[in-house]
Amino acid sequence: MFKKYLAELPDLETADEAVYTWNITNWKALEKKVHSETFQCGGHPWRILFFPYGNQSDHASFYLEHGYEEGQAPEGWASCVQFCLVLSNPNDTKIYMQQSAKHRFQADEGDWGFTRFIELRKLFSQPFTPEGRHLLEDNSATLTAFVRVVKDPTGVLWHNFVK
């Protein structure tokens, strides 16, 4: 299943991989900003940050975020991660939308993802399949995170050097 969503990185060594599934229920009653439960990958905590009605956009927004509490990440912490977030119909996983990225997470840059994951009108009012099925069904959806932590022997992999 991993290979379906994440391209191989032949020049990099994988440290760990994890799959986390979050069953999102009662979507329309959710707060503006929601976190999933925390899960582990590469010896570090991770979670999904979710804006059901968008993060300053007209799209549902999903991000992968380190799960350390404020100020609790180890000093100098960084983790290089390739990930794919897949939003699927809770009753039929063949109906889905996906977005992938790779990012160097750091204590002060703890989330990365997709402000424009999927348009809200496509979620709530437009059928997602020719048969008329919706991605959001029974006010629910499933979000699956495929997470691959890669080793960074150079200490600068995917570093943006802005700071």
Go through each PLM region and give its residues.
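Protein/peptide-recognition domains central to ubiquitin and immune signaling
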Residues: 1-163
